[in-house]
Swiss-Prot record:
Residues 756-942 form the Lon proteolytic domain. It comes from Yarrowia lipolytica (strain CLIB 122 / E 150) (Yeast). It is an enzyme of class 3 (hydrolase). It is found in: Peroxisome matrix. This is Lon protease homolog 2, peroxisomal.
């Protein structure tokens, strides 16, 4: 339907949608001009002008179309019957953003209208080519000059040509666009046909219905403040939304009615929600209801999601801001309620703080420590418990209160014999370390024998001499007594030799508490000295934590794996931090970064353990008394297994001592063929496996009576278990432990063929690095070549140099040895069997030299001979280490004729004096050599004339 209506250009970013009421501001001149358009002529004889007649005709047609009723007979002055066209404007900013005036349906130069209420000479503003047919509900006087009109949207319109643009209120031709389905005043027959729903339209309708329903639900919630305010400000529109939403269901009936309802719902929701101007323009431009539903459902869903997120963020921020205040108020209310009910907690915050204060005041602290504690107590009393610093300060004070400032363990000073008995019961051998510990215990006992009166007199005299001018003790002037300082021992040895258990035995012998601190993998200096309290999660260092856990200030502290402590890095140097702890002249005033005042560590007995000394810094090593613990020999392992391991594993596996019998030869076979280690850990595992196997055999031999297992005591009384043999034999080990892990073919050959000899084959002696020794065979051969020496068997640099020295000595003494070989025409190959095992060291020099001499002279070497020693280019035999292990290894291999350097005779004498060899050395024929010529004489009973060294 076409009509002519007054044209009202809306303010910027303003859109009037059908079915929605809105206030629009007008100037006084514009309001008067609009009313004059519908004013009756004063003279009854004067007819309406042509423009007025067209305007009145259009208004009458629209009134009939929209079924508007007059409320009085006051002619066209009744404001409720005045109908106008409201068109949104395109601002200059929007024109610049789009880059062209015709963007978004803007008119050409003919459709540009002036801003209402201004002179026509001012800058024009473009308007959209579509708008809304509105009726003026009422006029309102907003001030002395301006007016406001309340307009109600009736339908969409399409803007045509301007009819009159001379006045303040222009008129224009419009086309009313109710919908695209033909429901207008001029609808044809096709409008009677019922439209159908497509799948896409149904899906969009469901989204629209769900979004609208969720908006209403959110508005009903108490915490949805944003939606509540919107709904409250648009009460009329909100009521219309509820009415249309009730009509609109998930299963629509009449498609025509449902479309009308959905179209009206989109317009109403776009008016309620704070949507953008562009979104409202897009909905207003959608003349087709399906198109309007599609755009509206998309816009509403997006805006609804954004508003839900905004509501959630606002709620979260508000809750976090008020959390502390709410907690404080709740605590106060809870305390008041408990007081009224008489249910107050006797152990409240104040009571705990009072108890902590009393505990701190009762400690015997130094003046510096007492000053720090007093200051922190004053601080914490002024803080509210909700303050973050409160818990930090309280943790610090609790840490100080839990430290053993004046708590110590009274040493159970036993006699030297009693202490030795305790150490011997826990460990076999280790006589040198036991000797050092007994020395300390003896000194401690002698000091304790002084009378209490003498000690009191000395303390009184020392206190009087160190008093300051005010009669108070001056700690800075008090001399430090180092006479009673405990030793700082470093036990160095391979794994499993009993370093950790030895420290426990020392604590048991003294009656002191034991504390173990693992230093392996410590890479941060703060783990030793502690963190400063300014850091989040700060805590004391390992030593302060250890004292806190053990509860006394004089424990035996084991510094385990001190050789594996980290070196200098960007976290500091932990090894350097240990210098103060392990210095007897400094650890009395050890300052932890967390405590931040001196703590006395001088009363602790520090025992450190390490596997080697190479990784320990020299300054740190200098502060400790090093005691070497060598690996156990096979004979020592035999005694340890008999005395400690077998009874322990027998009991652990539910057997009695007499129910498992492992002879010495079986234990020795386990040590040599199944375990080769410095300690006894793996040996204990193998013995445990043997005991478990015997436990299975013993359980099988038990008789069953009526399905119940007969007890061992009952069976013993009956004389049962005749089929059970408690004795373990070597033949049983294969079934229990499997095949032998280590085989000594060379030793077996020496035992089975004692008279067989081979040219160029010699038995050396090697220390295996696990506390054990054994044979190290060398094989030499020659072939035509160019005088090259080839070495195989995974030999290290040192042993390769020893081989070169040996060959050079043979070449230089070839004439004296009666060797006529042309060394430039032969290649020499020296091989050490067991090529997968690395071999290194200078102690095989004598053996390799003898192999070369045997090769070139063609003389075989008896397999019953073994030797060790380093050799120089002049043929001098130098001393080597590991003599005890090498001799015992040779004995187990069946070799009893040994050649040692003369300088190692003292080592053999010392072992015989200590008796740690179990009488093995007395059964061996040991020869001592000083030069290589002595070796040749002992092997082949030949005398050689060495070369005369020229002195010219």
């Amino acid at each position: 339907m076409d009509a002519t209506l007054p044209l009202l250009t809306l303010p910027a970013d303003t859109v009037v949608l059908p079915g929605v009421s809105m206030k629009v501001g007008l100037s006084k001149e514009t309001a008067v001009a609009m009313l004059k358009l519908f004013e009756k002529p004063k003279d009854k004889d004067v007819a309406y002008s042509k423009a007025t007649q067209d305007l009145m005709s259009s208004v009458n047609k629209l009134q009939a179309f929209f079924k508007l009723k007059r409320t009085s007979a006051d002619g066209y002055r009744n404001a409720s019957l005045i109908t106008i066209a409201c068109v949104p404007r395109i601002t200059q900013k929007q024109i610049k953003e789009t880059g062209e005036n015709n963007e978004a349906g803007a008119h050409d130069s003919e459709s540009v209208t002036p801003v209402l209420g201004t002179n026509s000479t001012e800058v024009n503003t473009s308007v959209y080519s579509f708008g809304t047919v509105c009726r003026i509900v009422r006029f309102e006087r907003s001030g002395t000059e301006d007016f406001q009109i309340v307009v109600e949207g009736l339908s969409r319109l399409e803007l045509g040509q301007l009819v009159d643009k001379s006045g303040l209120v222009p008129t224009a031709r419009i086309k009313v666009r109710v919908d695209e389905d033909g429901e207008s005043a001029s609808s044809d027959e096709s409008s009677d046909k019922e439209p159908t729903w497509s799948k896409t339209e149904l899906s969009q309708l469901e989204v629209l219905h769900a979004s609208a329903k969720e908006i209403i639900d959110l508005a009903a919630k108490s915490n949805a403040t944003q939606f509540s305010k919107l709904m409250a400000s648009q009460t009329t529109v909100a009521a219309s939304v509820m009415k249309q939403l009730t009509k609109l269901g998930p299963n629509p009936g009449s498609a025509r009615d449902t479309r009308k309802t959905a179209g009206m719902l989109v317009d109403l929701l776009m008016a309620i929600l704070p949507t953008d101007f562009e979104d409202k323009i897009a909905v207003l431009a959608a003349f087709s209801i399906p198109e309007r539903i599609a755009k509206g459902s998309e816009i509403l869903k997006t805006k609804l999601d954004m508003m839900k997120i905004t509501e959630k963020i606002d709620s979260t921020v508000d809750s976090k801001m008020n959390k502390q205040q709410r907690e404080y108020l709740l605590r106060q209310k809870m305390r008041a309620i408990q007081e009224e009910l008489g249910e107050t907690d006797d152990r409240g915050e104040d009571d705990d703080l009072k108890e902590l204060t009393q505990k701190l005041q009762s400690l015997k602290l130094s003046p510096e420590a007492d000053k720090v504690v007093s200051r922190e107590l004053k601080r914490i009393k002024r803080m509210p418990p909700t303050q973050a610093e409160y818990q930090v300060c309280r943790t610090y004070l609790e840490t100080i209160a839990e430290l053993p400032w004046d708590k110590c363990t009274e040493d159970t000073v036993v006699t030297v014999d009693q202490a030795r008995t305790i150490l011997d019961n826990d460990h076999y051998g280790l006589s040198h370390i036991k000797k050092r510990l007994l020395e300390y215990l003896a000194v401690l006992r002698l000091k304790s024998l002084r009378s209490e009166s003498e000690v009191a007199q000395e303390e009184t005299a020392a206190a009087a001499s160190s008093e300051g001018p005010n009669g108070q003790l001056d700690d800075s002037a008090k001399p430090i007594d180092y006479s009673n300082r405990a030793p700082i021992l470093l036990l160095v040895g391979p794994p499993g030799v009993g370093k950790t258990s030895l420290a426990k035995s020392v604590a048991r012998a003294l009656g002191r508490k034991f504390q173990r601190l693992s230093l392996g993998g410590v890479r941060d200096e703060s783990e030793i000295r502690g963190h400063r309290r300014t850091y989040v999660g700060a805590m004391p260092g390992l030593f302060i934590q250890g004292l806190r856990q053990v509860g006394v200030n004089n424990p035996v502290v084991l510094l385990d794996e001190i050789d594996k402590i980290g070196g200098a890095n960007f976290h500091g140097d932990p090894a350097a931090a240990m210098l103060e702890v392990l210095d007897p002249e400094q650890n009395a005033t050890f300052r932890d970064h967390y405590i931040n005042f001196p703590v006395d560590l001088s009363k602790c007995i520090f025992i450190a353990t390490a596997n080697n000394l190479d990784t320990i810094p020299a300054p740190l090593l200098d502060r400790m008394e090093t005691v070497h613990l060598e690996g156990y020999t096979y004979m020592e392992k035999l005694h340890i297994a008999k005395k400690y391991l077998v009874p322990k594993q027998t009991k652990a596996n539910g057997l009695e001592v007499d129910q498992v019998v492992i002879p010495d030869d079986v234990l020795l076979h386990i040590c040599t063929k199944y375990t080769r280690e410095a300690g006894v850990r793996n040996l204990e595992r193998k013995i445990g496996a043997v005991c478990r196997a015997k436990a299975v055999d013993y359980a099988k031999s038990l008789s069953a009576d009526d399905g119940e297992l007969i007890t061992v005591v009952d069976e013993a009384k009956k004389g049962a278990h005749s089929s059970y043999d408690p004795v373990v034999t070597i033949e049983n080990l294969t079934d229990i432990l499997g095949m032998e892990v280590y085989t000594d073919e060379d030793a077996q050959d020496a035992k089975e063929e004692p008279n067989s000899s081979h040219i160029g084959v010699v038995n050396g002696l090697a220390y295996m690095g696990t506390g054990n020794g054994g044979l190290l065979k060398f094989e030499a051969t020659q072939m035509p070549g160019k005088g090259q020496l080839k070495l195989t068997g995974k030999l290290g640099d040192v042993i390769q140099e020893s081989a070169q020295i040996a060959l050079s000595w043979v070449k230089s003494n070839a004439a004296a040895l009666h060797i006529d070989t042309d060394f430039d025409k032969v290649d020499i190959h020296l091989h050490a069997p067991a090529g997968a095992i690395p071999k290194d060291g200078p102690s095989a020099g004598v053996a390799m030299t003898l192999a070369f001499v045997s090769l070139f002279m063609g003389k075989p070497i008896p397999p019953s001979i073994a030797m060790t020693g380093e050799m120089t280019l002049r043929g001098r035999v130098l001393p080597v280490g590991g003599i005890r292990e090498k001799l015992l290894g040779a004995h187990l291999a069946g070799v009893n004729r040994i050649m040692l350097p003369l300088a190692n005779k003292r080592d053999v004498d010392e072992e015989q004096r200590k008796g740690g060899d179990g009488g093995v050395l007395d059964k061996m024929e040991i020869s001592y050599v000083k030069y290589m010529w002595d070796v040749l004489e002992l092997v082949w009973d030949l005398r050689f004339d060495p070369m005369i060294e020229s002195r010219l």
